[in-house]
Amino acid sequence: MHLDHHHESAAAVSADARRPDGSRRALRIGLGGPVGSGKTATVAALCRALRAELSLAVVTNDIYTREDAEFLLREAVLPPERITAVETGACPHTAIRDDISANLEAVEDLEDEVGPLDLVLVESGGDNLTATFSRGLVDAQVFVIDVAGGDDIPRKGGPGVATADLLIVNKTDLAPYVGSDLARMAADAKAARGELPVVLQSLRGEDGVREVADWVRERIAAWTA
């Protein structure tokens, strides 16, 4: 389920789009959102959906552990050399917005060690509704919320909800059990975001990530055009 409106602008260039050897670097997409909203599950589903057609890698962020990276490794969504972790040691937004050096180094190391990449997914540690990525780190941002957090979250807004290039309302299958009104969430998201796209998804089905994967494909096409 999704709102049928799209934002067609090409992916913004966050930094030099060329590597030192002159080749085009990978498109970088950041995924942020509150703790437990389903960021890692979405990353895993995207890897499964795209790994046959794109050369991709993942950088995860946790404060003191490698928990999210270890989950992806256990799920075998990508070969181990394509998954790396940053231990931020501080609030998650610091490493994706204020001091992006560790994440930039992780991304560049992946490109050096794995070879040419089409896409790098950078997953933030769980944060609040104000979390945003530096455009020096990523070219596009996805923000993930879930219905269990309350159907008033889109109305409350915040930079993540209002300005991310894509908003995902996740775990729609739980709506009947937690009393969330999906139509209200969709309408509030549209009011907060205007023409920016929104996807309502449940990853319980095999094609649950299809719309988000299609959005990523559009960004890749714009990046390589």
Swiss-Prot record:
Residues 1-21 are annotated as: Disordered. GTP binds at residues 33-40. GO terms for biological process: urea catabolic process. Pfam families: cobW. Homodimer. UreD, UreF and UreG form a complex that acts as a GTP-hydrolysis-dependent molecular chaperone, activating the urease apoprotein by helping to assemble the nickel containing metallocenter of UreC. The UreE protein probably delivers the nickel. NCBIfam families: ureG (TIGR00101). Belongs to the SIMIBI class G3E GTPase family. UreG subfamily. This is Urease accessory protein UreG. It comes from Streptomyces coelicolor (strain ATCC BAA-471 / A3(2) / M145). The lineage of its organism: Bacteria, Bacillati, Actinomycetota, Actinomycetes, Kitasatosporales. The gene is ureG.
